[in-house]
Swiss-Prot record:
It comes from Serratia proteamaculans (strain 568). Residues 10-204 form the tr-type G domain. Residues 81-84 are annotated as: G3. This is Elongation factor Tu 1. The gene is tuf1. Residues 136-139 are annotated as: G4.
Length: 394
């Protein structure tokens, strides 16, 4: 039987498993690849292939993550699974594996546990938009009422963190039994895959979002004007369109009078491309690295925000000592460092290397930002932490 070849035309969706240690995240990941490969074609991945997660670096932080891929009839999924709790925290905060949706695994034998709560909170803070629940190990629970109780607890916990706990899908299954090929439990994996397809909307592609280009360099070309260079993060900029220069200084409007790539002139610059954009009426000294070029009105400059951060441990090349309130590091956004002060939550006196913490940050210059923007925390050019803007304040 010939397998159909992988079609690039299918929408691509990023998902991942989250949840408490030993609740079966990796077993479920293996079960999904195995059952879907058997049902729709594709390749299965064994538990130990997934559990042996390779190290990767994101924003100077080493994270162990496993990536698997699988297909449903309508979509192609890239799925991330992490072996340890600390890897999840780092992964979610750095955005190393951006998730369009997550599968929260809860063992029916235990119900929600401390890391279940922490992963849900992190999901809320870092902007995981959709959660589907897989209640695992249901083959080990005979009492229907107990299953009802666990499901209710999980739904209430999700609602407490502003997810639609009453409405989101919950699948009761057994990853291990599905992996062993028991039809009744394999059907639950197919049911879960159906919810991935129907409950997680197709993500908006970067190219369809409003134009944004983080400025890396500025040149002036005699007789032509000022050119800014950088990689288009999202959207499209066309010659003749109005753009705004946002961040650090007051916002200024200009017009794009040319786009070039590899010294060739283009009509437009698109998401993912490294381009030079020629700006009308802008002096070389009016614009600097760290600002962004954006579609007018699409992004505002801010100095104050609530954030979720991970502080590197000593072994990861981070600080050797804790820090306290009044700590003033640099916050590296996109292409530049900005000094900021921090405020710790009530009852938190100090932050140790290896901790993750919620903190309020006030920057000395405004930066173009939206909720979900990633940043690094640096001291003299050395990365000591990573963070994400949970909520813009001012």
């Amino acid at each position: 039987m010939s397998k159909e070849k992988f079609e690039r035309t299918k929408p691509h969706v990023n998902v991942g498993t989250i949840g408490h240690v030993d609740h079966g995240k990796t077993t479920l990941t293996a079960a999904i690849t195995t059952v879907l490969a058997k049902t729709y074609g594709g390749s299965a991945r064994a538990f130990d292939q997934i559990d042996n997660a390779p190290e990767e670096k994101a924003r100077g932080i080493t994270i162990n993550t496993s990536h698997v891929e699988y297909d449903t009839p309508t979509r192609h999924y890239a799925h991330v699974d992490c072996p340890g709790h600390a890897d999840y925290v780092k992964n979610m905060i750095t955005g190393a594996a951006q998730m369009d949706g997550a599968i929260l695994v809860v063992a029916a034998t235990d119900g929600p546990m401390p890391q279940t709560r922490e992963h849900i909170l992190l999901g809320r803070q870092v902007g995981v938009p959709f959660i589907i629940v897989f209640m695992n190990k249901c083959d080990m629970v005979d009492d229907e009422e107990l299953l009802e109780l666990v499901e209710m607890e999980v739904r209430e916990l999700l609602s407490a963190y502003d997810f639609p706990g009453d409405d989101l899908p919950v699948v009761r299954g057994s990853a291990l039994k599905a992996l062993e090929g028991e039809a009744e439990w394999e059907a639950k994996i197919i049911e879960l895959a159906g919810y991935l397809d129907s409950y997680i909307p197709e993500p908006e592609r970067a190219i369809d979002k409003p134009f944004l280009l983080p400025i890396e360099d500025v040149f002036s070309i005699s007789g032509r004007g000022t050119v800014v260079t950088g990689r288009v993060e999202r959207g499209i900029v066309k010659v003749g369109e109005e753009v705004e220069i946002v961040g650090i200084k007051d916002t200024v409007k200009s017009t794009c009078t040319g786009v070039e790539m590899f010294r060739k002139l283009l009509d437009e610059g698109r998401a993912g491309e490294n381009v030079g954009v020629l700006l009308r009426g802008i002096k070389r000294e009016d614009i600097e690295r760290g600002q962004v070029l954006a579609k007018p009105g699409s992004i505002k400059p801010h100095t104050q925000f609530d954030s979720e951060v991970y502080i590197l441990s000593k072994d990861e090349g981070g600080r050797h000592t804790p820090f306290f309130k009044g700590y003033r590091p640099q916050f590296y956004f996109r292409t530049t460092d900005v000094t900021g002060t921090i405020e710790l939550p009530e009852g938190v006196e100090m932050v140790m290397p290896g901790d993750n913490v919620n903190m309020k940050v006030t920057l000395i210059h405004p930066i173009a930002m939206d909720d979900g923007l990633r940043f690094a925390i640096r001291e003299g050019g050395r990365t000591v932490g990573a963070g994400v803007v949970a909520k813009v304040i001012a």
